[in-house]
Amino acid sequence: MSVKGQMLQDPFLNTLRKEHVPVSIYLVNGIKLQGQVDSFDQYVILLKNTVTQMVYKHAISTIVPGRAVSIPHGPTPTSES
């Protein structure tokens, strides 16, 4: 995954995790999973509900927070010319 991809995903997922925001995760096959982000790394998200599920990121289509979240904005990377 590119560095820019991580710069977008990590703050978003970390905010969802720290604020215990309920989420709906839609998989590429159309299945909807619901719960809270318990943990994540480069390849998987641990989704906690009545049980904890390990969801591989490559199987995820969309993550929809149950409420509005504010994502912290870091410094914008500059491209070298």
From Swiss-Prot:
Signal peptide positions on this chain: none
Keyword terms of this UniProt record: RNA-binding, Stress response
Keyword RNA-binding in record: yes
GO biological process: regulation of DNA-templated transcription; regulation of RNA stability; regulation of translation, ncRNA-mediated
Transmembrane segment boundaries: none
Record InterPro entries: Hfq, LSM_dom_sf, Sm
GO MF annotations, alphabetized: RNA binding
Sm domain: residues covered: 10-69
Pfam family, one: Hfq
CDD domains in the record: Hfq
GO CC terms, sorted: cytosol
Role of this protein: RNA chaperone that binds small regulatory RNA (sRNAs) and mRNAs to facilitate mRNA translational regulation in response to envelope stress, environmental stress and changes in metabolite concentrations. Also binds with high specificity to tRNAs.
Similarity-based family: Belongs to the Hfq family.
Quaternary context: Homohexamer.
UniProt name for this protein: RNA-binding protein Hfq
Encoding gene, per UniProt annotation: hfq
